Amino acid sequence: VLRGITLGPVATQDIIGTVDLGEFDADAGRLVTAQLVDAGDNVIETTQFVLDSTGAFTVPTKAPNGAYRLRLKASHWISNAPVVNLTGSGDSVGTQVLTNGDVDGDNSITIFDYIDLSGSFDLSTGDAGFNAEADLDGDGSVTIFDYIILSNNFDLSGL
């Protein structure tokens, strides 16, 4: 009891949704970072989860009810930050498609990503110098198809 106020356990509520890792063959097993941010872009909570074969996720939060953004980021995808209005009843952000091509992980798709991808061009898993982050389609090799993905999303930045 503090000045007549009794502090009790903070209720946990869930944010649910689905992540689709754009242009990638195997979403299952990929790590996603989720940040709950307020209107001032202050990070309230951070958690990580591993995608299953459906991409479905549940993020528990102790944040009070209100409007937030749930910033979702995976390794070589730029972040997306849908609005979520916490009401205490399993609030959903629906399906969020993350944009592929951020080879260097800086949340923007730029010439530096082309440079990193070029360093692994024509290499496959197990080859010396292979950068798994440059394998944008997840087929185990860095090919022209990875360049196409990067080119289609060039000059985009995450939220």
Predicted region positions:
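Cellulosome-associated attachment modules in secreted, modular CAZymes
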Residues: G8-L159
